[in-house]
Amino acid sequence: MAYSYTEKKRIRKDFSKLPDVMDVPYLLAIQLDSYREFLQAGASKDQFRDVGLHAAFKSVFPIISYSGNAALEYVGYRLGEPAFDVKECVLRGVTFAVPLRVKVRLIIFDKESSNKAIKDIKEQEVYMGEIPLMTENGTFVINGTERVIVSQLHRSPGVFFDHDRGKTHSSGKLLYSARIIPYRGSWLDFEFDPKDCVFVRIDRRRKLPASVLLRALGYSTEEVLNTFYTTNVFHLSGEKLSLELVPQRLRGEVAVMDIHDGSGKVIVEQGRRITARHINQLEKAGVKELDVPLEYVLGRTTAKAIVHPATGEILAECNTELTTDLLVKIAKAQVVRIETLYTNDIDCGPFISDTLKIDTTSNQLEALVEIYRMMRPGEPPTKDAAETLFNNLFFSAERYDLSAVGRMKFNRRIGRTEIEGSGVLSKEDIVEVLKTLVDIRNGKGIVDDIDHLGNRRVRCVGEMAENQFRVGLVRVERAVKERLSMAESEGLMPQDLINAKPVAAAVKEFFGSSQLSQFMGQNNPLSEITHKRRVSALGPGGLTRERAGFEVRDVHPTHYGRVCPIETPEGPNIGLINSLAAYARTNQYGFLESPYRVVKEGVVSDDIVFLSAIEEADHVIAQASAAMNEKKQLIDELVAVRHLNEFTVKAPEDVTLMDVSPKQVVSVAASLIPFLEHDDANRALMGSNMQRQAVPTLRADKPLVGTGMERNVARDSGVCVVARRGGVIDSVDASRIVVRVADDEVETGEAGVDIYNLTKYTRSNQNTCINQRPLVSKGDVVARGDIMADGPSTDMGELALGQNMRIAFMAWNGFNFEDSICLSERVVQEDRFTTIHIQELTCVARDTKLGPEEITADIPNVGEAALNKLDEAGIVYVGAEVGAGDILVGKVTPKGETQLTPEEKLLRAIFGEKASDVKDTSLRVPTGTKGTVIDVQVFTRDGVERDSRALAIEKMQLDEIRKDLNEEFRIVEGATFERLRAALNGQVVDGGAGLKKGTVITDDVLNGLEHGQWFKLRMAEDALNEQLEKAQQYIVDRRRLLDDKFEDKKRKLQQGDDLAPGVLKIVKVYLAIRRRIQPGDKMAGRHGNKGVVSVIMPVEDMPHDANGTPVDVVLNPLGVPSRMNVGQILETHLGLAAKGLGEKIDRMIEEQRKAAELRTFLTEIYNEIGGRQENLEEFTDEEIMALANNLKKGVPMATPVFDGAKEREIKAMLKLADLPESGQMQLFDGRTGNKFERSVTVGYMYMLKLNHLVDDKMHARSTGSYSLVTQQPLGGKAQFGGQRFGEMEVWALEAYGAAYTLQEMLTVKSDDVNGRTKMYKNIVDGDHRMEPGMPESFNVLIKEIRSLGIDIDLETE
């Protein structure tokens, strides 16, 4: 296998046994693909596919005026260029977006002509607002902050059949219902009531009998009965009644008389129940008619109206119950044929017939009116209004759309074969749904499982943005329609008709404040990736936390390979917010698909198919770990498989598919937990959630025990710098990498230079630090896709969230009681868990009513000492160390409380005494913060003079840009001259540049000429002269292009900033705060084993082994058995082996062993103990030495999820490292030197420091703000609040009889306003007495009682 630049430097020993059939797909594809589809940015107008923006425009246009004399058609759209790049947008606090220009055509028809002749056509491009662009990492920059649009898992449009699980009626009877859910439009529900009549609801309003809807559709009672029922035909002749016999229909009935065959033999005796055997005999005997007594027909329902043969009078309407009187009447009239409905209690209930009986309407108009009354109660119905309303409900494409998905699901559910069709409902659709519902009630067919992933689909960014855009366009449409009628008379252009504000507002609202547009979690690369791959059931059109029951949240069999069963938040959102599985993707309909290998007749092929939950149901799917031989045949007699959403076993020849990888079940975060298969699910959930909260440490340290997914996450997250094209590193420093691109990757006419500017010490959304460090050195050769620089939490291109710590599992002096963690001081000294946090503090100078605020170093009543870190503009220097309360930006605000007399005004004007009329409103460092100023940004409004600091910053930025462009030019020029040198060498000169005719060009000759003179050479060959001219022209063009680029950037920098109204200047100061680990910080492993640091002990007191090596962390062994996360123990053992092997390699290098010996030892590590074979033969000796040097701190191992290291392999590794195979060793107490009485598990575990730091939570209050009504101190750190002294705490003091302490708590320390002021004064005077008064809460109580209308007063004696 080929190794990338970074992989070669440090290979992970991989324990996986199963082959890699398929690489993990690009992890951010779900976001990027969806939005690319929405914008279709590169497409020309004939290439537009009917999706995204294009589809939204087509669904609203053409807009036709009310009179029909003018129409506005849509032609196409184009996207402009963004004004700023992503970094500039973040800095300036603006949205990263492009202008959208739509080409529309206004057509005006001739009123006079009868055939709508076209009178005038105008085409014009109209600006339709800005559309946010997605960055290459799948985020949006909205108002300067990075946001992610989370995908939504919602109920797919279509038709669903369900029952109430017996909860509605006290009898526990199942009431069935059907619901047609469109993509947009009214919902249509059919439901049974306890009396078995069918009702319909539109948009969950009051219910009507379902027959009302059928009548409104134009069906008569007879047509309805014909559609839903078959009939029994009776012949009447005199007193005799005979039935046309269909034997099957008699099954289960009790014979009312003896039934004979043709020969008079009795087949069924009277009073016996008719069984299948009897029916067979009847069919054999060929009985076609059966004489029945008259009572047999009583109580049956007529299927057609019964008409008097002579007079034509209707004796009985259809759907009438036959009674004795009616039968007499019919017999008198000599009717010979009666048709009745065939119903029974088993599989053909009389539900529709009963519904028709309770229906009060009798024709279509009455039904329409009834529906109108239900939808618009209180409005007088007219025929037209009722018809229009009904048609608009389900049959108008403007108001109703099932969408392609909905139509496909609808047709499949009601048993049609075609999957395409109209977006609106038809009569047949509604009847088919009712038929299916009645069938289910009759016991044919089953209800749907709403939590099945075949019934829930994912709405991604693109689709949601399209919906919002359509909403905006519909708002525009109304306004355009009204203006269109004026278009002709006033000669308006399309520009005048369309107001883009509603569209822009709808888009802005969606990206800025939708529930699914979220502030991106940016603690570390994993939290970014997970956030982008999140799937939420909440949000507009989704569920709400309160209403979501247990079933929706639970893991469903169809989640397998689509949604992770482990990763979901704890708390109220559990199960509603999920994560995509590692290999999952969405199909064209938005259903989640998982990949499978195709299996034919027990042989596994390498073909891969992606299947949705519906398609997979009928397949027999083997596990990825199913045993195979070399010919890829399944060899077990019975293979463990999934079939029909159940786990079972089948013979190999029955298997049709096989999983591609064991980790396809879990999400990215869960697949980063080694030995996940040995952890309890609850703890694995915590483990995957806590990895997202890890803070990037100062020096990232790769996990010794990983899973092999680390590299994928680091690469796909976008925090590393990945080579866009291969080439040679031309120059590299801390802030940029310049690559001279390989010739075969340079397209003609473009520069063969890639410049990568690294991000240095930038603030993330969570205030952690984003910093990139180069991995390459000058002259290195890199290929496309190689990682050239590490980002936060990455180490040599691998995700590195924490640090490898030497841990011991032992109880130790109670310091690790209840999940506490005991740390060694060495961890602090080596800065293992030191993190950098960057805080952005902003100072805004506004224009106030009393005059403008000013940013200045001239602040009233502030000593020199406080100003020594400010420059002359009043802004702090970069590099200054500042603490709480220090001034960062000096700002004064005019104050105008005092009214000045005219005399005073005059004196002010003459002597300019300014200090008294401004107040100090400087930006100061908040309490509890100290750090270093690492950057300052100044933004000035257009037209306001820029201060010296702003100009200095601008100059610095311009120098950076110029440096980049010059570098690019230098390399382009160098490459051009290199090519010329190769072409000219050994050629003959014709003159020019001071050379004689006939001179042969050599390197020396060329070195003697300046570059400018090369172009003056006239060569003997014309082709060479042409090449020289082209090269000269190319260099001139390139220079001009770069100069234009520079001017463009300069213009952007020098134009004023677009600030909010009333803001003159904004200064942003960035503070870097260094936080060491300290007691109170939260730490965790990757297995949900979390704890708080309780104590940091001196190194010499920590337990140590026989060699004197102390442990770094002591964990409590009691935290393991009850929580069942044994993975941490296995990780500890394997970590010990990894470290031991590293130390062994280190000793070999120190002893200066030969490369061959190292190669042998490395081969033993990588290729002799289980897992994947590494190809070390292709490495040169230098590469082997480089590899060995990178392994000195430990050989990193990968134990993939569900396919990891076995116990025997861990033991073999420990043995190879010359360590005890038990993984336990004898420890000594550092304080006494005594042995502990039994050996202790010691090893290396990967520990994370979580973003729950004691510094952010700890807080102390002296005096501060008070609540307005109760006059009690506020609560919480943000409000600088006090400590709550609640009811139970009062009881505690009462119990101790501490009366004076209690009095103090309830009065002067709380809400006794006068008492606390007095006390403050007393303390200032050195007098520590207190005089409690009346607490304010007493006055509040009195006011509350008075508000009840009771007059109450406090009487004082």
UniProtKB/Swiss-Prot annotation:
InterPro entries: DNA-dir_RNA_pol_bsu_ext_1_sf, DNA-dir_RNA_pol_bsu_external_1, DNA-dir_RNA_pol_su2, DNA-dir_RNAP_su2_dom, DNA-dir_RNAP_su2_hyb_sf, RNA_pol_bsu_bac, RNA_pol_bsu_CS, RNA_pol_bsu_protrusion. SUPFAM superfamilies: beta and beta-prime subunits of DNA dependent RNA-polymerase (SSF64484). Its EC number is 2.7.7.6. It is an enzyme of class 2 (transferase). Pfam families: RNA_pol_Rpb2_1, RNA_pol_Rpb2_2, RNA_pol_Rpb2_3, RNA_pol_Rpb2_45, RNA_pol_Rpb2_6, RNA_pol_Rpb2_7. Keywords: DNA-directed RNA polymerase, Nucleotidyltransferase, Transcription, Transferase. GO terms for biological process: DNA-templated transcription. HAMAP family: RNApol_bact_RpoB (MF_01321). The RNAP catalytic core consists of 2 alpha, 1 beta, 1 beta' and 1 omega subunit. When a sigma factor is associated with the core the holoenzyme is formed, which can initiate transcription. DNA-dependent RNA polymerase catalyzes the transcription of DNA into RNA using the four ribonucleoside triphosphates as substrates. This is DNA-directed RNA polymerase subunit beta. It comes from Pseudomonas entomophila (strain L48). The gene is rpoB.
